[in-house]
């Protein structure tokens, strides 16, 4: 049986970490692409040499030509400029939109049957643009953000309650930004919804509100600490979870930036919602029941995403 071919577009901190995890998990043959000559080749060789230590037979190759990703089953896109202190994700839009155009054209020409996961920020606008530039079916192009945001939410809950992260199920909706919506009523610790934890005294409402606020600013917290870049370990793990569900047809329900066609009362845009990921790509959107407060927060987040889409259209008239 032929092994899957995984193309990692961008050999920066996330790209290199993706290659390392994919190799350890033996997800398939790995192509690490970057326009910077030597960078993908060096990282691929380093990880390949490490495989002799962690005992996995893997194929890794660093490349600088999109032709080398021909026939890729999965493409994970991290290419672009990362955030630095004082920058919002939205500040990256103009630069990274041009990158998405080049990447989309490369995928369209050489890997038109791939399942594409976009990580580049501002995420919701970039995955929308990438789908248009690539021309791939909308269910085969999704964005990684919700898995990461929900993981941060879960970790902060675990840290505060002292409960294993394995027994915490946390969810976020909306765009990947400060207006994201941590779904307090639908998130659980040991099966108990978070409002019930407050009633039982595990958490105070003030503590829960603090966790929600920290979740929304989770990426910025790391940017401020690193000073020279943004998060890469957790984003890479999140994308690998999505790719694994696709390659192994696991049908996992994961929050991702997905193209909506009427779900949540929205149509024609990408935004973070829970979705079943299987061999068909984004196979089914899961719709949470939302109250008036949640609807209002979600609507605010969606408006932020729409604003970024309009900004993209103003830069590139090919986007519709």
UniProtKB/Swiss-Prot annotation:
The keyword Electron transport does not apply. Substrate binds at residues 83, 89, 121, 152. The active site is at 176 (proton acceptor). The keyword NAD applies. One of its GO terms (biological process) is lactate metabolic process. NAD(+) binds at residues 10-15, 34, 96, 119-121. SUPFAM superfamilies: LDH C-terminal domain-like, NAD(P)-binding Rossmann-fold domains. Keywords: NAD, Oxidoreductase, Tricarboxylic acid cycle. It holds the Pfam family Ldh_1_C. Catalyzes the reversible oxidation of malate to oxaloacetate. Belongs to the LDH/MDH superfamily. MDH type 3 family. This is Malate dehydrogenase. The gene is mdh.
